[in-house]
Every structure is written in C-alpha cells, then in structure tokens.
Amino acid sequence: SQMLKDEASLSRAKMSKIDLANVVDSVVEDFNSDLLNSNKNIKINVNNSNLNGSKLNVLGVESKLEQIIANLLDNAISFSPSNSKILVICNIKKKNAQLIIEDEGPGFNEKNIDKVFNRFYSNRPEKFGEHSGLGLNIVKNIIELHGGSITASNPRGNKKGARIEVLLPIYK
C-alpha cells in the first residue's frame, strides 16, 4: 500500500529543523477552509498561547508531519458530531514538543484504548462506515521514526471526546 511505501521512504528522507506550530497552523487552515464547505459545522481551534511566541522546533520531514496532523484531524472530524469544536494545542512539555488534539465525539472505548494504534484495529462504531484501521498505526510508526510517541485517552471528568497526545523531541 502507498502508506507503507511512504513509511519506508521516511527512513531515507532528509530530516530538517521544522517549526511544528507553523505546520499545525497551515494544516488546520486548510482543514478549516474545507470545513466551511461541509454541512457538519465543525471548527478547529488552535491554541499556541503557551509558546509565548517561541518556535516549536523539531527534527523531521515536513510532509510526514503534515501527514500525521492531517490524519489525526481527519479522525477527529469523522468522529465529531455536527456543531462541535476540535481543539489543537501546541506546547512544550519537558524536552518535547507537545501536540494535543481533542474532539467532542464519542471518545475511545476504555477497554480497547491501548489497541487503537494496532494495525487493522478499528474503534469505529458501524455508523461511521468502513475503515481500514491503518491510519493510527501508520501515524504511530511515523512518529516513532521521528523519535516521538503518541498516546490516546479520554479527557478526564465528564467531558466527552477523545484526546490524542503526540510528543516529539525538541530540536535546538
């Protein structure tokens, strides 16, 4: 499959210093303009305020980082009810760039939450239609090739939705 070939090409691709917050902004901008033309009325909000204007540099392949963000946003959108918001937060956590994506959808099934990154595992209720389940597995592989990690959780408290956290080493 194309995505698996992409994965192999990443290990050979040239990595460079990239401002992750910039990549997030441009991907979200594209998604928001597409969402304006959809009838679900979903808005993606980015919160970079914790960065205080400093760059969120990581060592990576820009097209792959875009692919990760797009894939995670795609998932969030497909699980989101109409008239809801998706929150994207960029932050610094210890020595990592932190990217959090939270939606207001049904959230993860708690007992299968550690399986969501497995290949071919799909957490989708039937009404979301067919899905290969490859998405999160490939996202995880690309993130790990960048020296990072990804975790899934349900936001604490009685908030609905799913929360994905990506950590990538900060590149000085």
Q: Residue locations for each model-derived region?
A:
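Acidic ATP/Mg2+-coordinating residue in the GHKL
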Residues: 103
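Conserved micro-motifs of the catalytic ATP-binding
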Residues: 8-13, 53-60
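Short conserved segments within the C-terminal catalytic ATPase subdomain
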Residues: 34-49
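Short helix-loop "hinge" at the ATP-lid/N-box region of the Bergerat-fold HATPase_c
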Residues: 76-77
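Conserved glycine-rich
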Residues: 148-149
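Short conserved segment of the HATPase_c
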Residues: 108-120
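Short beta-strand/loop element within the Bergerat-fold HATPase_c
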Residues: 83-95
